[in-house]
Structure formats: structure tokens, C-alpha cells
Amino acid sequence: MIALIQRVTHASVMVDNQLIGEIGAGLLVLLGVERGDDEQKAKRLCDKVLGYRVFSDEEGKMNLNVRQSGGSVLVVSQFTLAADTQKGMRPGFSRGAAPDEAERLYTHFSDACRASGITTATGCFAADMQVSLLNDGPVTFWLQV
């Protein structure tokens, strides 16, 4: 399971010109679910994302996690993160989880974020989405479990 996290000052997601998720300062989490992923991996990745210290403290050092910073999380499914790009000029998607399993684990991950007490917005699984963000830094990390 892969999370591409970006520290943002704000982020939003639209489907069919309708706003469906929006946050202020916090983390945009692009989530890719791979074959073999399970609830345990989703929970581990959630804990890692929410605990990852990417926000600045009073001294300007990245010592605070999203909770400590008072931020929110926007979780957006992105199956292309599971792409195999090693060969050729076209990505392969055989490493990605089947859609029904990916949706189940995406929901599990999002629910785990909410259960932790973090304000969590989401995109719409498998929809054609337009994601807007203002990357703060820029600060972007690839996390994988």
C-alpha cells in the first residue's frame, strides 16, 4: 500500500463539477492499493501517515505531525501509484488490487483516519476527479508498507 503525502495549505476534490471533499492546512494523501494489501497494512500506513512529522515546530524544524499541527487530511484514491514503470513507455497496472478490494481498503484507511480523531475528507473512489491543492514547501513524501 502506497501513500503519496503532500503538505498543503488547502486542497479540494471535485467530481462532475461538484465539490466533494475539501480541507484547509494538512495533508493530501494520494492512496494506491496493491495486490496483497490488507486491513493490517491499511492501519499501519494510516498510523505512519498521521504520525509522520512533516510540519514545522517553533524553530522551523519538521517535528510535528498532522494532529500536532491542527491539520486535516484529504484522502484520494489513485491506482496509478501501483503502476509498474520499469519497462517500456506505457505503465502496467497488474500490481494494483482488484477494484472491489481496493475500494474496501481505501474505505478502511479513510475510516481509520477518522477514528483517530483527525478531520478527514475523501474523494470518490474510481471517479474521474479534479484535485486542487496548494503544496506547502513543497513537502512531498512517498510512504509504503
UniProtKB/Swiss-Prot annotation:
Reaction catalysed by this enzyme: glycyl-tRNA(Ala) + H2O = tRNA(Ala) + glycine + H(+); a D-aminoacyl-tRNA + H2O = a tRNA + a D-alpha-amino acid + H(+)
Molecular-function GO terms, alphabetical: D-tyrosyl-tRNA(Tyr) deacylase activity; Gly-tRNA(Ala) deacylase activity; Ser(Gly)-tRNA(Ala) hydrolase activity; tRNA binding
Record-level GO cellular component terms: cytoplasm
Subcellular location: Cytoplasm
Keyword Transcription regulation: no
One Pfam family cited in the UniProt record for this chain: Tyr_Deacylase
Motif (Gly-cisPro motif, important for rejection of L-amino acids): 137-138
InterPro entries according to UniProt: Daa-tRNA_deacyls_DTD (IPR003732), DTD-like_sf (IPR023509)
Broad EC category: hydrolase
EC number(s) given by UniProt: 3.1.1.96
Keyword field contains Hydrolase: yes
GO terms, biological process: D-amino acid catabolic process
Annotated keywords: Cytoplasm, Hydrolase, RNA-binding, tRNA-binding
UniProt subunit comment: Homodimer.
Function as written in the Swiss-Prot or TrEMBL entry: An aminoacyl-tRNA editing enzyme that deacylates mischarged D-aminoacyl-tRNAs. Also deacylates mischarged glycyl-tRNA(Ala), protecting cells against glycine mischarging by AlaRS. Acts via tRNA-based rather than protein-based catalysis; rejects L-amino acids rather than detecting D-amino acids in the active site. By recycling D-aminoacyl-tRNA to D-amino acids and free tRNA molecules, this enzyme counteracts the toxicity associated with the formation of D-aminoacyl-tRNA entities in vivo and helps enforce protein L-homochirality.
Family listed: Belongs to the DTD family.
Protein name as annotated: D-aminoacyl-tRNA deacylase
Species in which this protein is naturally found: Edwardsiella ictaluri (strain 93-146)
